Every structure is written in structure tokens, then in C-alpha cells.
Regions:
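Glycine-rich phosphate-binding "P-loop"
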Residues: 1-11
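Acidic/histidine-rich catalytic cores and adjacent linkers
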Residues: 14, 19-49, 57-61, 80-229
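Short alpha-helix plus adjacent loop in nuclease-associated cores
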Residues: 59-80
Length: 229
């Protein structure tokens, strides 16, 4: 099944999904989504037999954003330090964004040196970076639901003082996030489709008429344009 919706509003998505029929909707066993609360309530409303799984990559993105925000805030902190420590912190943080966010095992030798400088200058960023790496590893290495759930609980305890916003969100979505350890489902395919849709929009210099865009998108994937609403 494929559905293209003109808006992200819940009622618009529901209208399209309702056209699939109750029989199809009742047979959906799992829905992978990002951390959007309205969509979760919609799934519960129209897909009674579906389990919701949060895409692990959206959760990881949230961690990255909070780490980067802490990096930016450290620049503000540096202004109130003495000249020597201020220069050390500023110099280490300059150009450090992608070094901090990229998986440590994938860093170049130069980036490893930069990471060492940042950790030396900012104990807080050092801890947050370590927690970021641990968070990534628990999704990569947990063999089953039990192990993944226990490791995530342990991570939440250690991270509560550093990733306050993320910890609150993960706690609120705990069941849906830990569902990944059991089913290993992500939105990877959908994200790939979205990237192609963005490319299509660029090639078409934008589409003012949604029906024209819908037909072009269906033809792009070799679906008959008769599927368009």
C-alpha cells in the first residue's frame, strides 16, 4: 500500500488511510513512526491490532541535537572563564560539531585529536559524548528485548542529569522505543521514499497542485496514475 497526503494534519492522514478499508487496517500488525504524539493516537484509533514502534534513528537524532545544544551553551560558559581557560574551551569547541556527533569509531585521526581536545576542555561534554556513544551501542549490540530494555533503563539513570529533555521523551515513549529490540523495525524505507520525493520536487521546481505532484510521484515509482485520488 502507498499513500500520499497533501498535509501532515491528522484528519488528512486519516482520510487517506480510511480509503484502504477496515479489512486492511485491521490486518496492520506494526507501525513505525517518529516521536509525534498525534500519529500514535491515530494508529490506536484506526489500526486496532497494530503495535507502534518508534524509529531508533529519530531517537538517536534527538540525542545528537541535545549534545550539540550543550556544545553551543559551553561557548557561552567560556565567556565567564579566565583568559587561559576561555581560550582553551573556545579553541577546542571551534569546528567540533561533526566530530562530537559522528560515531567515534568512524573518526579520522585528525577528528580523534579534536575530540581529545574537547574532552580535556569540557568535562561535561566528555560525559555527554560518552553517553551518546553508549546510547548508540545499546541499539547496535542488544541481542533481544530483555537485554535492550535493561540497558536502556541503565542508560536513562546515568543520563538523567545530562540529557534531561531526551530522558523525559524516552521515558514517555518507553514501550514504543523498546519495541525495536523485539521487532527491529525502522522507517528506513519511508525515509528513502521521502528523499526521492524531495528530489522530485526540486526537479519539478515545486508543485502548486498536489494532484499533479501525486501523479508524478506515482509514475516515478512505476505505479499507475489511476491510483491518485
Amino acid at each position: 500500500m502507498i499513500g500520499l497526503v497533501s498535509e501532515r494534519k491528522q484528519h488528512k492522514i486519516e482520510e487517506v488511510m480510511r480509503t484502504w478499508g477496515e479489512k486492511v487496517l485491521s490486518q496492520i500488525e506494526e507501525v513505525s513512526m517518529d516521536l509525534t504524539g498525534n500519529y500514535k493516537s491515530l494508529v490506536k484509533k484506526i489500526c486496532p491490532n497494530a503495535e507502534v514502534t518508534v524509529d531508533r534513528f529519530h531517537v538517536t537524532k534527538m540525542i545528537y541535537e541535545e549534545l550539540n545544544q550543550a556544545r553551543i551553551e559551553q561557548k557561552i560558559v567560556a565567556k565567564f572563564l579566565n583568559a587561559k581557560n576561555r581560550a582553551k574551551l573556545f579553541d577546542s569547541l571551534k569546528g567540533s560539531k561533526y566530530t562530537l556527533l559522528r560515531a567515534e569509531k568512524k573518526l579520522s585521526d585528525q577528528q580523534k585529536i579534536k575530540l581529545k581536545e574537547v574532552k580535556s576542555a569540557s568535562p561535561m561534554i566528555k560525559i555527554m559524548h560518552s553517553l551518546k556513544e553508549e546510547f548508540h551501542a545499546l541499539f547496535e549490540k542488544s541481542k533481544d528485548w530483555g537485554e535492550g530494555t535493561l540497558r536502556l533503563i541503565d542508560w536513562l539513570k546515568k543520563a538523567s542529569s545530562y540529557y534531561q529533555k531526551s530522558v523525559k521523551t524516552i521515558t514517555r515513549w518507553f514501550a514504543e522505543i523498546t519495541g525495536y529490540f523485539e521487532r527491529r523495525t525502522t522507517k528506513g524505507i519511508v525515509e528513502g521514499i521521502n528523499n526521492k520525493l524531495k528530489l522530485l520536487k526540486r526537479c519539478g521546481f515545486g508543485f502548486r497542485n498536489f494532484n499533479n505532484f501525486e501523479m508524478r510521484a506515482l509514475l516515478f515509482w512505476h505505479f499507475p496514475k489511476s491510483l491518485a485520488h
